Amino acid sequence: MPLQNLTPPPHTQIQDNKSLKQNSKQENKDENNVQNPEFKAYELEAVTIEAPTFGEYQKYQTGQVLDNKMLESAPSGNGDITSILRTLPNVQFDNSQLKSTTPGEIDPANISISGGLYYQNNFQLDGFNMNNDLNPLGSAIGGTRADSTTVSNTPGRSQGLNIDTSLLESITVLDSNIGAAYGGFTGGVVEANTRRPKKDFGASINYQISQGNANPNAFSLTQYKIPQEDLNSFLNSSNSAQQPHFIKHSFRSSIESKINDKLGIIASFTTMQSFIYLNAGDSEYLKNTLEGIKKTQKRQSYNFFIKGNYDYSDTLSLELSYAYAPQYNNYFLAGVKDSGFDFLTGGHQLGLKSQKLNALGLLSTQASFSYMDSSRTNSENYFAYWRPSAEKNWTVDKSATQTYKWPQEGGYGNIDQKQINMNLKTQQDFEALQTSILTHNFSVGAEFGYVNAYYERVKDFWWGSYYNLHPLKQGQSCLDSDRFCSASPVYFQGTYSGESWANNIGQFVGYGSMYKKGKIALDSVTLGGFLQDDIRVDLSKAGTINARAGLRLDYDTYMSKATLAPRLSLNYIAPWSAWEYGKNFGTQITFGANRYYGRNLFAYRLADGQSALEYGISRSTPGAWSYESHRSTTNFQKIKVPYSDELMAGISQEVYMFALNLKYIVRKGRDEVRRMCADANGNLLASSSECKWAETNYTARYIYTNEGRSDSDILSIMFGNEAPIKLGAMDNFFMLSYDRTNIYRNYTDFNTDITQAELNNEMIYYEGIGFIKLADKPGSNFGQPITFRLSTTHVFPFYKTKWSMNNFFRIRSAYNAMARIEKNSRLYPDKVMQYNGVPVDTYIKFKVPWTFSWDMRFGVDVNVWRGNTLSLAVDIFNLLDTTNMYLLSGDYGRASGSPMYETGRQFWISVGYKY
């Protein structure tokens, strides 16, 4: 089905009908007539408050909607709500999202909307926020961070809940000219709206499978793109950053009932399961003392959902919903005994909505509670290195002197991170106030929220360092409770660091760290409100002017900052748009000037104090430890709230059933958050490494500042049909889009350390551009310069079957990935450019070629008996198995500067049954 445009809905959805009274009857008439709640009229006595219908021109070119039919017909893959947004312009993905080395992952994709950072979008489920503000930077699960996660940190993701699209009626993406009802973003708003019950009784079940095996002689539904010289090491991978063999299972089910004209209930259960088969360790490790030669890592996502709708009267409607969406990602540390652990994300969300027609118009109120996790569980509370011995024997090099060959065991300990939110929102939409040529539609809203976020190390964790392993000598013994002492003689009999291991009877750890159990917590109260007037000026034969002016106020006790965000959108509708013979050629012109304030993440505060839980431990003989306390490496201080100023202009043109939309967006992000290493007086230090060891050696501390900035300009064009093109009995829809994106940002994310050069905005050399200021350097990710997209849907009924095919074609332009050479480089001094005789940081380009992909879904629905439908479908990603390269910018000569490849052709096969 076609993509749709819309004017931004209020915080709380209005009913899907012209009046609350008509709701049940209308839904029973046509279960497929799904419309966005805002775009229907509601009646109160003789007064009618109207808004554009779902298919009308959007007044302010705010965004797009993917409706239920688009969600069902498009290739779904993992089924997360962001991956399917690849069909939309103004939405950019992480360069490495489709990488061929990690096809077994199931986490939702990170997206940038209109140049914003991926963790500065506002994700909502039925109007309730589901943002992860604990630590969204940890989203690189399946990359290098997963197996080498630090002792104190855990991965996260930008979305608090991983919601499956099978639950949804629509996904709304707001990317510009966003009304004052929305706050807490500098990117965009993604609103997932769940389905309502429509049938007297209905049920559905669906199973989907995909798998991959990189072994050239094995059956595989997934084609890997691995360089031949890397294939052998990839096939023997023991690291989740390289996944040569996986299988995915998806199970989806739902049940619904319109019990009567007033009450309806819908419930669903979905799960996505991925099993990734890896070696327990590389060739340096014996496997017989581990759990087995092969180990299986798991990714398991669950969605439990129930929602009830109750029309209490003609003027009052209630909706209650509950979602439980946990995800368990299981890992192990390669070659490390007893090292399994889980990352737990997701959680609970409970919401209640009411909609009341009153004397003023429509009053919408909603209350919600959410409980979200970002925790590490099931991990051992110790980690130890050992020299090889009869007891510590899981290494092939019995006399190993290199520490990476030494036996290791244990995990990093359990960490409990929670984000608990309670929110209350209310909004009054007033009945229209009309004069001779003016019509005012006022809206006012208020919000109250409370959040408790905390980081807790559940138990004491002990780390035994390889720096100070000592021989256990004659007359010494190990205590039974001492995990860091072994009475098994070590094979090594030489001398190390002046200490003889001859005739040893074992070994013990003499130095390490103890991370004491403890909790770091914060509470924050948020207040918000907005006022908005949507004005219509009827100029008769000269057309119509619409103006939406709004003001949004937000305050929170976390940063103790109040922000005031003006929003202004203007729209002109040409006069012929209303003529009998001109309405098929309607024209609209749109302008906008808006400010959006983002969110300050709780990670800034929770980082302060984590390293203070660490104690240095040491001993010269087996027995008691001596302790040395450490200080925090981060000093939290209140900072400003990041914001983005937006200017936009657009034009919409209708030609019969076709619509052309052109939009140009300019955004300037300021006061954006990044990290710096500072001395006790807050002055920038020359090297951020001074902060990494601040717990013992320095008074240096990491601090978060508002030195980040960005500039974006995006041009997008969309053209498609709003009604089906009939070819016999076949309905055909298509949507063609183009976007051109330029993003300039002086950092990557909030943990990117500031350098003195950046603070001074020094000159750099950027190959292909020349000498520029550092702040003018193009962004290195989420900024594909040019993208063409074509989406087509074809539906053909035949006898008792319905055949459907969806195609999605995407062409992405070539781009330059940049490798940096520092101005004082000793390895490549001949490549460093000079500006006025002074060496400057030099960025060397690597040309990444154009890429093409074709994704397809082909399905058939068979009416087997009285509306009982059997469904079969095949999803094919990268149908032509093209080799698409990507490259992450990094330092010159490093691995990050090596080309990588996206996944090749991949099949998903599904079967379902619906009643």
Predicted segments — roles?
Residues K21-N36, T48-E50, F54-G179, V189, ...:
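Periplasmic N-terminal accessory/gating domains of Gram-negative outer-membrane beta-barrel systems
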Residues I111, R157-N162, V173, F185-I209, ...:
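N-terminal periplasmic accessory domains that precede
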Residues G202-S204, S240-Y328, L344-L360:
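Transmembrane beta-barrel wall of Gram-negative outer-membrane proteins
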Residues N441, E447-V451, K517-M657, Y664-V666, ...:
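Structural signature of Gram-negative outer-membrane beta-barrels, strongest in the C-terminal barrel
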Residues L539, K663-I821, G912-K914:
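Gram-negative outer-membrane beta-barrel transporters
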